[in-house]
Amino acid sequence: MKRIQIIDSHTGGEPTRLVVSGFPSLGRGTMAERRDVLAREHDRYRTACILEPRGSDVMVGALLCDPVAPDAAAGVIFFNNSGYLGMCGHGTIGVVRTLHHMGRIEPGVHRIETPVGTVEATLHDDLSVSVRNVPAYRHAQGVVLDVPGYGPVKGDIAWGGNWFFLISDHGQRVAGDNVAALTAYASAVREGLERAGITGANGGEIDHIELFADDPEHDSRSFVLCPGLAYDRSPCGTGTSAKLACLAADGKLAPGVVWRQASVIGSVFHASYELADGGIVPTIRGSAHLSAEATLLIDEDDPFGWGIGS
């Protein structure tokens, strides 16, 4: 019987499952190198944690690792039901809040190593978390593609830690009771991008689709389709970072000004940025709440022990 220790949290409704122990050793390389080892040699541990019957399509996993740098608080590898994520904003907020719950950190500034670089996270006295993300930038503006059933769609391609296609003029109602229609639309857009061979820089797969709409109480409301056809319950940290990159490029948001980004279910991140060479460095602030501590049991005789569909 294999045992995996986990602590669950949610950030604005979006769950994060922190794996504390039970995964095989991945060596002492960078988080990117360890992610590659995990994907190549031990991927069934990801599926056991995230796929049914223990997980769900919406859950994001975060493997807690010893950091490379001595001044880093932790290393982390993010994954979901379809594979691995370079960075995860809501997940980082959840990880930092959980590290405090574990007694490993106190309020202050902490460095967290991820596969796409080291991010700075501030745990505030009220236990909210600000994440100073990796640099974000807009790769392409006003990209038009034809989407069967919907016609021409125009959007921007931006990097915020993952690759996004951001659409403001879409004709869809961004609301919690319209998720099925939003998912169908965003999925069709993603398929259209793949069919047209449209990518991020260096052929990076655009695996996140983000739709924006006006919000009566905040600066914007968004719907984010993540890899694997799950939608983000939170405003999406990397997606908000990509949005800030586009706003900055258009001259619509000045450095240091707070942008209030609501999610499709109404949870909110507060975001701002500072300028950097060729782009911006976003900071995302939100709150996470602890929801469970558990030991996952994997019986080798269980036909679904490593996840349904694994």
Swiss-Prot record:
The active site is at C88 (proton acceptor), C236 (proton donor). The keyword Isomerase applies. It catalyses: trans-4-hydroxy-L-proline = cis-4-hydroxy-D-proline. Keywords: Isomerase. Its EC number is 5.1.1.8. Disulfide bonds: none annotated. Substrate binds at G89, H90, H208, D232, G237, T238. GO terms for molecular function: 4-hydroxyproline epimerase activity. It comes from the Bacteria. SUPFAM superfamilies: Diaminopimelate epimerase-like. Gene3D superfamilies: Diaminopimelate Epimerase, Chain A, domain 1. Homodimer. Allows intracellular utilization of 4-hydroxyproline, one of the major constituents of host collagen, by converting 4-hydroxy-L-proline to 4-hydroxy-D-proline, which can be further metabolized by intracellular 4-hydroxy-D-proline oxidases. Belongs to the proline racemase family. This is 4-hydroxyproline epimerase. It comes from Burkholderia cenocepacia (strain HI2424).
